[in-house]
């Protein structure tokens, strides 16, 4: 299913010097987001920084949201992950998409202008309405929590 989402270019380099987000293949779930920087940024081990993307989106449909996720190669090869682990973009947000990055690696990492730093995936949203009850219907699991189902 294809859904149109309004996007506003906040930095004129986006679409010119830095490509617009696109799906790499017909089966891709995520769109790459790029660091819209004037100069390279050095991210020291243990450091975090907030990177602009040069884009704003307005999803407008309350049955959708976007999540900003790490790129697997940055985390696995360089230890660079999202500072907030996952970013959630609500349907009514209209500000610039910013990406918090954290270097959990042992080496400094240089982020170049236009470098792909994260990916964005659109997801369906179900808004719940809570129903106050005194008890729940019994289940096999019950209140079993962390580690309850074992390792094998």
Curated annotation (Swiss-Prot):
What positions does the entry give for substrate binding? Answer: 71-73, 84, 88-90, 98
User: Which terms does the UniProt entry file under GO BP?
Assistant: dUMP biosynthetic process; dUTP catabolic process
What Pfam families does its record include? dUTPase
**CDD domains noted in UniProt:** trimeric_dUTPase
Q: Which InterPro entries match?
A: dUTPase (IPR008181), dUTPase-like (IPR029054), dUTPase-like_sf (IPR036157), dUTPase_trimeric (IPR033704)
The source's superkingdom equals Bacteria
Q: Name one GO molecular function term.
A: magnesium ion binding
Q: Which cofactor does it need?
A: Mg(2+)
Report the family membership: Belongs to the dUTPase family.
Instruction: Quote the protein name from its UniProt record.
Output: Deoxyuridine 5'-triphosphate nucleotidohydrolase
Origin species, per record, is Klebsiella pneumoniae subsp. pneumoniae (strain ATCC 700721 / MGH 78578)
